[in-house]
């Protein structure tokens, strides 16, 4: 019974929907019938005569003014359409038609039709969109005092945006603070320092934290004269204060390295003490987690200082030791620093070993992973690659593997080749990047362009093959080939991360819709005709009459038919006559 009742209700509902669909036709015929019945009381014939008389009395100037007014309104609509498209990336009229008018006219709403299918895939797609649009810490970020500030002193431009620096401040508060910092005066000061917006205020707070720690140790040491050395070890200096000074106050890499070495001494002592107390409660566990982050950060920056100062082998050893000591801390992406250092040493076998570990389907990809894999495969064939020879004999297996690796890398981040091929100018990389975005492309090319130039023929192979990727994925926002569809949010996030003087690379490149171009041409042509008709009415009348005579002439019709149907002389039964004198004029 329940199934029968449900079926009856569904049938009744479908009948009602069907009746509402065709109700407008019934309404239309009813209106026509009422107009016919009331034609005498409403004096429809007299009104039609009056309207026709009014239209006959109108002069051509009225039509010219009407055309000009309509062209002006169309131009305003066009300007609004262009502004809306530049800001939101879509046509306003198209969006209104699809979103609002299509459901009213009986169109199918994609959201409602796919409601049943979206329940299974919503979670996966949402997770993917969140991961694709997540902002990551740049593993190869520069030093503010020794590199970013020097760029500002020379050029007068700010290489970092407020949004980027705000994200760095949030990272510092996450990595270098914990809930028990208020128990130690120096850590309490540094907790406030990481939230300061003014760089000088942060540097002053770091010096204050070091001075407080020094004064406290001097006061407590004389209390127990027999254990002076023990008291000095009990009160280590603040490691996070040294980190801030090394990052922002040091004007050279050598000065930053000295400060990081002092921070390492203080941070190592705090780490060993908190390691022994981490199981005594949640407070000690949080403190040990903070000390671990501080120690890993210091060692990583020391390795980067060694890399900047030319001690590449020492930097590689420090990075390997750090990855062995803390294998679970993947948030710093130390393997990307290691890959760049190994490429500098031209240790391609070691690079391949690192890629074999991290270029896994279960691990998140990056431009460094994909393009380094492409570089290694291109290195095997790039010195002998020739586009002409490849077009004649076809691609070999090794060349095909290299081309596929380049296509894979370009699909992941299509902005990188423009910087590697020097089609766009490089800027200093930001402190945060967006995977598959322009910011990640800048960060990768800034450090890896020299490695591509060092491999003979690699850039030539990239130049010949990278654009072929776009033929494999004609609709990258809807469907990808080896990766998920390209995220839409990259342009907005990159504009927040990159400085205003840099032209953000957009993919896929937005083109003006045909509707806007057609409207612009039609409005411009109509406005020009209206202006010419108003200024030169007699001349435009002669021109219009001549055009009508040309298009209505027999010669033009014969010539048009001959050009379309490709008639031959035998079918005409006479030789083709030359064009008439009237048509030649």
Curated annotation (Swiss-Prot):
Sugar-bearing residue positions: 47
Tree of life domain: Eukaryota
CC per GO annotation: membrane
Disulfide bond residue pairs: none
Record's bilayer topology term: Multi-pass membrane protein
InterPro entries: ST7
Subcellular location: Membrane
Keywords, sorted A to Z: Glycoprotein, Membrane, Phosphoprotein, Transmembrane, Transmembrane helix
Residues annotated with Phosphoserine modification: 386
Transmembrane segments: 15-35, 62-82, 512-532
Pfam families from the UniProt entry: ST7 (PF04184)
Family designation: Belongs to the ST7 family.
Protein name: Suppressor of tumorigenicity 7 protein
Organism: Oryctolagus cuniculus (Rabbit)
Gene field: ST7
